[in-house]
């Protein structure tokens, strides 16, 4: 199974703070609560393509 790099972007300010590797066959976008150093708080981060 091939892995691909995915960037997680903050839903508030839009900065791409995290990168992860995930399966290329996933159909849904990943959404997790992570700390954004630019906003200074935990915000929802979404997968970008």
UniProtKB/Swiss-Prot annotation:
Keyword Ribosomal protein tagged: yes
Instruction: Write out the coiled-coil annotation as residue ranges.
Output: none
**Highest taxon in the source lineage:** Bacteria
Gene Ontology MF: a single term:
structural constituent of ribosome
Under Pfam families, the record lists: Ribosomal_L33
User: Which UniProt keyword terms apply here?
Assistant: Ribonucleoprotein, Ribosomal protein
The UniProt entry, under InterPro entries, shows: Ribosomal_bL33, Ribosomal_bL33_sf, Ribosomal_zn-bd
The GO biological-process annotations, alphabetized, read as: translation
Q: List the record's Gene Ontology CC terms alphabetically.
A: cytoplasm; ribonucleoprotein complex; ribosome
UniProt key word tRNA-binding: no
Q: Where is the signal peptide?
A: none
**Family that this chain belongs to:** Belongs to the bacterial ribosomal protein bL33 family.
Q: Which NCBIfam families match?
A: PRK00504.1, rpmG_bact
| The name this protein goes by in its record | Large ribosomal subunit protein bL33A
């Amino acid at each position: 199974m091939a892995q691909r790099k995915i960037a997680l972007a903050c839903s508030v300010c839009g900065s791409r703070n995290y990168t992860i590797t995930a399966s290329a066959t996933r159909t849904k976008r990943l959404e997790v609560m992570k700390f954004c150093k630019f906003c200074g708080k935990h915000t929802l981060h979404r997968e970008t393509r």
